[in-house]
């Protein structure tokens, strides 16, 4: 079976798979770089990427920022400049700094959940980075798109929809989300 490439703005993943961001040492440069090298979208998790840094206990935030930047650059290198994203939870205390770190270190996209990323368009403004919220309902994306359109005159580049079996697309979920996806696409094209 031939799959169509995934296009997000000017980014193209030959294989339409976005690897999920799994925290604390799972989704780092090795996994994300390998996925992107094979043609998918590799995703690094911003949840404690610096846990192996020698000063992690004393300087947690600095260790995490340093490690995240290094993991992004390393994943880009492993993947031969494939599509690399970062999953940043809205609930993280230093959310804005994580977004800035992604932009400064060459991540291609940010995927953000664990809350509604209401400030994300403002934080990425002026950069080339693509962004997406993680939502579980049409209502959530309608609220975000309405807010973003009013405040920033924009909406996200794509949307990640997570159902009760997050990260897994089953036939039953495809039916349920088909209408939702269509409505999201219509909204995106009208902005």
Regions of interest found by a model, annotated:
Residues 1-191:
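Active-site entrance/lid segments in N-terminal catalytic domains of soluble metabolic enzymes
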């Amino acid at each position: 079976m031939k799959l169509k490439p995934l296009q997000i703005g000017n980014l193209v993943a030959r294989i339409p798979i976005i690897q999920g961001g799994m925290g604390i040492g799972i989704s780092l440069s090795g996994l994300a770089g390998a996925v992107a090298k094979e043609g998918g979208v590799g995703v690094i998790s911003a949840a404690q990427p610096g846990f192996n840094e020698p000063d992690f206990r004393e300087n947690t935030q600095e260790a995490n920022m340093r490690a995240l930047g290094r993991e992004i650059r390393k994943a880009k290198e492993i993947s031969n400049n494939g599509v690399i994203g970062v999953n940043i939870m809205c609930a993280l205390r230093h959310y804005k700094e994580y977004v800035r770190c992604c932009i400064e270190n060459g991540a291609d996209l940010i995927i953000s959940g664990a809350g509604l990323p209401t400030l994300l368009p403002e934080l990425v403004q002026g950069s080339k980075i693509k962004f997406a919220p993680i939502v579980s309902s049409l209502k959530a994306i309608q609220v975000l798109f309405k807010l973003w359109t009013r405040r920033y005159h924009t909406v996200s580049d794509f949307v990640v929809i997570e159902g009760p079996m997050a990260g897994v697309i089953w036939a039953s979920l495809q039916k349920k989300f088909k209408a939702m996806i269509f409505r999201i696409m219509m909204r995106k094209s009208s902005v």
